[in-house]
């Protein structure tokens, strides 16, 4: 199985950029909540946009804060009522510390004149890394990205009220399925293509449908990222 994503034309996302720049004229920091289901390409897009926008400004004005850092740790999942289910369905909305996420968004909104820290996620160990992302005063555009950032249930919906711009990256289900199964396989999370597909259908595709059915109205719906090549026997 081989899969790539076309590098997007950054100008296709100028509406998002222009809104952020306009807001910067009147406030010190702009918070963007960029949501999309599993396999939508949101992490890829955010990295591309951050690089392009930082180059335009000539400084590191953009900082990305992924939702992945707010996974409950494996140790915390093992304290759930059903730890086996929690581990098997890790990535579902309830396996994230949404209260911690909301608290951090609120902090980033309020405090702009000193360094703050957010957690990252280390895929090698399968757990969050506390205070791994440093947000500095020069980081005036913060892009929070993740599956559940636009959910219409608290505390996710409380965080939504703090975003200056709510953006959504849609994806076709067949595309998402191919991307996520490929990711599970190449990361070593699944040993075979069949196992990767089964895990994707059991968990990620359900999460994608949940995101689509339970989100607030975004301010901007972004252009989908396109698949360049998919070569596989099963997808």
Swiss-Prot record:
The identity of this protein, by name, is Putative uridine kinase C227.14
Name the Gene3D superfamilies on file: P-loop containing nucleotide triphosphate hydrolases (3.40.50.300)
Q: Which Pfam family, any one, appears in the UniProt record?
A: PRK
Q: Which family does it belong to?
A: Belongs to the uridine kinase family.
Protein source organism: Schizosaccharomyces pombe (strain 972 / ATCC 24843) (Fission yeast)
Record's GO cellular component terms: cytoplasm; cytosol; nucleus
Q: Does the keyword Zinc-finger apply?
A: no
Positions bound to ATP? 36-43
Q: What does the record list as GO biological process?
A: CTP salvage; UMP salvage
Give the Enzyme Commission number. 2.7.1.48
Check the record and name the SUPFAM superfamilies matching this protein. Answer: P-loop containing nucleoside triphosphate hydrolases
Q: Which UniProt keywords apply?
A: ATP-binding, Cytoplasm, Kinase, Nucleotide-binding, Nucleus, Transferase
The metabolic or biological pathway listed in the UniProt record of this protein is: Pyrimidine metabolism; CTP biosynthesis via salvage pathway; CTP from cytidine: step 1/3; Pyrimidine metabolism; UMP biosynthesis via salvage pathway; UMP from uridine: step 1/1
State the compartments where it is located.
Cytoplasm; Nucleus
First-level EC class: transferase
